[in-house]
Amino acid sequence: MQNTQKTAIVTGGSQGIGAGLVKAFLDRGYNVVANSRNITKSGAFEASDKLALVDGNAAEAATAAKIAEAAKGKFGSIDALVNNAGIYFSKHFTDYTVEDLRSLVSVNIEGFLFITQFAIKQMLVQKTGGSIVNITTTLVDHPIAGINSAVPMITKGGLEAVTRSLAMEYAKQGIRVNAVAPGIVDTPMHKNDPKDFLKTLQPMGQISDVKDIVAAIVYLTEAGQVTGEVLHVDGGAHVGK
């Protein structure tokens, strides 16, 4: 266990990768601010003086402000941010609607934009650097026949692009910006999907566990010389199938 006395923000923190990440950061001695729409009612975490829970839609600027204020007010800093909140749904390209596009942009792009702006502003004030990790998907780099995801990839591909841009923009200030690109992960998103089929989508023939993704995020959060990196944790899916 580390005793970093640093503060990490995790959006989409009530289940799956987000919940696993909150627990991992707490185990490593971080103060943690976790957000989801109803996280205070989720029952996912034991009470801790090192944990603050903030309800609300991360796609709204007001919620992002509340999250940032919770980190600064309760713990005094923002040292790490993981933009884990996101949505995905599969349709044929011609079936996506304007409402679908707006939902994807709202959560995946605006949800990233507002809280990341608050985090970077605070990191610049602190002058001690910081870490931002975005969550994308291996489908950005390697589309799979039968997995129709063109419109969601507009947003996820955008996150990969902005990851590299921000890494360059803030490198001299010690603010590192990276991304993790998972493949198929054993989370509630896939609870109704046939497991045997899901295993065929990754060359290693396995479904990734939440802990695999969490380990990658923690690594990037703490890897002081890594920035602008997109780390694939997908059983080789980004290489081919």
Annotate each PLM feature:
Residues 5-6, 77-78, 123-137, 147, ...:
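Active-site loop of short-chain dehydrogenase/reductase
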Residues 84-89, 236:
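Conserved NAD(P)H cofactor-binding loop of Rossmann-fold oxidoreductase domains
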